[in-house]
A protein has these predicted regions:
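C-terminal functional extensions of proteins
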Residues: 170-175, 179-237
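A short, well-structured juxtamembrane/interface segment
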Residues: 17-32
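Short active-site oxyanion
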Residues: 36-39
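Glycine-rich phosphate-binding loops that contact phosphosugars or nucleotide phosphates
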Residues: 41-196
């Protein structure tokens, strides 16, 4: 099988097994838009790319606050980031930099679902009664132990779990025992954009005015109204 063929199989599996949960998440997103609340999203390591995909994105919702902490992004140093995402207490520091309301929703992305930062972030949200959505690989996480002192993995803490269906180890292909062709980023981006698309469909069918970013590379399109509206609520705007 080629990488293309394996990716198509994975997308089909996600759609067939997770569509109902994606629709449920989309309903939550739509509710937050109607209520003028924020959709927060975070991920560490390569999962930050999935969080960033939702942020100030052409065709994406305007009320998204991505938690883009530099310490959790590989450009800060790959080995350093690996150590920091396992560090208990860091999530609390990052949390305190955000403007999150109890009526907002928080999406936490972690393919393994085992590291301290995503687990601790979910626990902090749970303590405060904030709705959480976890995006994780159930095939991977159920074969690993938590690195957080609670013993919990992400899927055991969040309110709603969306399975990326990615295999343990991430790679879709095998070469004499070596895994290649990682899939977690593709799967995560597909899932979050599917949630947004379904949320937009819900809002559109209800006749609600859509707050959606346009491409900054299309002449005549201006997002300044959204920047002004959210500049005091979204950290990295």
């Amino acid at each position: 099988m080629t990488y293309y063929e394996e990716v198509m199989k994975l997308m089909d599996e996600i759609w067939e097994t997770q569509f109902g949960i994606i629709k449920e998440a989309a309903g939550i997103f739509a509710d937050k838009v109607r209520a003028d609340k924020l959709i927060h999203v975070m991920g560490s390591g390569h999962s930050h790319m999935i969080a960033e995909e939702l942020f100030v994105r052409a065709g994406g919702l305007a009320n998204v606050n991505a938690w883009l902490d530099f310490n959790l992004i590989p450009t800060a140093g790959a080995r350093k980031t690996c150590k920091l995402e396992r560090l208990e207490g860091l999530a609390k520091i990052i949390w305190e930099e955000q403007k999150i309301d109890t009526d907002d929703v928080l999406v936490i992305i972690s393919n393994s679902g085992r590291n301290s930062v995503p687990v601790e972030t979910a626990l902090l949200a749970k303590e405060r009664g904030i709705c959480t959505i976890g995006i994780t690989s159930m095939k991977h996480t159920k074969m690993t132990e938590s690195r957080h002192s609670s013993g919990k993995r992400l899927y055991e803490v969040v309110d709603l779990v969306i399975d990326t269906c990615v295999p343990h180890g991430d790679g879709l292909l095998h070469f004499n025992g070596v895994q290649g062709g990682p899939a977690s980023t593709l799967a995560g981006v597909f899932i979050v954009n599917s949630i947004v698309a379904e949320a937009l469909s819900i809002l559109n069918e209800a006749g609600y005015e859509l707050s959606v970013y346009g491409s900054q590379n299309v002449d005549g399109y201006c997002n300044e109204d959204y920047y002004r509206r959210f500049k005091n609520r979204i950290t990295h705007l």
